[in-house]
Amino acid sequence: MDLKRQASAPLYEAIERFRKKRIVPFDVPGHKRGRGNPELVDLLGERCVGIDVNSMKPLDNLCHPVSVIKEAEELTADAFGAEHAFFMVGGTTQAVQNLSLIHI
């Protein structure tokens, strides 16, 4: 494992850069970084809803990662001593189902 490389967090860093730009999205999610649902902000906190954003070029694409998600997956694989690592958003059941499809 390359410890110097492990000091970076490419996906988190990209999300933070996006958050600091204070962009108001016109796509999903509908709460518009908290502006459209103050109750959600009360429940989860401003920081949480402020980084709940849709897939876009600066944040890469989970289905076909080419930048920050790809780099983060490579760092994860390196940290666990694996050849590959893949991020999932559908929960454990979906991850296991996807894993089983790889071997078909």
Write out the residue ranges for each language-model feature.
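Conserved N-terminal alpha-helix of the aminotransferase class I/II PLP-enzyme fold
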Residues: 46-95
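Conserved small/polar residues in nucleotide/adenosyl-binding loops
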Residues: 102-104
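N-terminal glycine-rich, Lys/His-bearing helix-loop that initiates the first secondary-structure elements
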Residues: 1-52
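N-terminal active-site wall of soluble small-molecule enzyme domains
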Residues: 98
